[in-house]
Amino acid sequence: MTIHTTRWGQSGPTVICIHGSAQGSRVGGDGHFAAQQVLAERGWQLLVPDRPGHGQSPANGQPDDAELDGAWVADDLLANLPGGAHLVGHSFGGAVALAAAVRRPGAVRSLTLIEPGMQKLASRDPAVRRFGMQLLAIKYLSPSAAQRARRFAAAVGIPPEIGGAKSRAELTAMGRGLFRLKVPSAATLQRQLADVAKAGIPLLVVTGGWHPAFEATGDAVAKLGNGTRSVIASPHHFPNQVSDEFNQVLATFMAKVDARRTSAVAF
């Protein structure tokens, strides 16, 4: 499998950033995590892959699938990093990062999930139920694939400058990708988060405070994975892009994790 990967920085602990979105988008990981490039100047090295069918990575004949993507993140990236890496996943990429973490827990220094697409874990919350019904209507009742992509982006709070869709052809491809996208079941996510907690992988869950469904989901994910919650004020689905606050929170979290690891090895 050919995966295009952007690298920022040449030294320091490794951070792997996994983006979300739907196949057909010409925006890759470097677009979704553009504001994190400055971390390379602060002692971190970042690996930012384009998932299959996104950005510069060719499609692999499969839909967006957290399990399949998690496998190559674990086996092609984590497996080749002797010191392991911190994993960061946004939206659907959060499900990918989670799948990778449970596949190779010993190689994961920490796991950070930004507005993870795991609403099935909070389906009892009224805001999440309404949001879920809205997304189902968008998926099945949109008059065209292009309209599906437009409506989804509006509902999920994806800014045009980040979400791509610069042409009708790209919109159509993304709308088709959204229809085929495979979201993990609640049972799968529960099991994986339990595995993360059992393995003692430090977990940080970040949301932007702009949508109650993402807040309820973030709370549920953090509870199941024995993680820490952080809310970084954002008007949309990308709290990692609105200011440097996310970078500061993430760097502090990862540095504390690494310090504890170093201390444990010393003893």
Indicate where each model-derived feature is located.
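Active-site loop/oxyanion-hole signature of alpha/beta-hydrolase fold enzymes
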Residues: 45-86
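Conserved alpha/beta-hydrolase catalytic His-Asp/Glu region
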Residues: 143-183
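Gly/Ala-rich beta-loop-alpha elbow adjacent to hydrolase catalytic centers
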Residues: 89-93, 97
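Catalytic active-site module of serine/aspartate enzymes centered on a nucleophile-bearing elbow/loop
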Residues: 225-267
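Short beta-strand immediately N-terminal to the catalytic nucleophile in serine-hydrolase-like folds
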Residues: 87-89, 114
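Conserved HGGG/HGGXW glycine-rich cap/lid loop of the alpha/beta-hydrolase fold
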Residues: 1-58
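Conserved serine/cysteine hydrolase catalytic core
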Residues: 167, 176-225, 230-239
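Flexible "cap/lid" loop of the alpha/beta hydrolase fold
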Residues: 102, 106-140
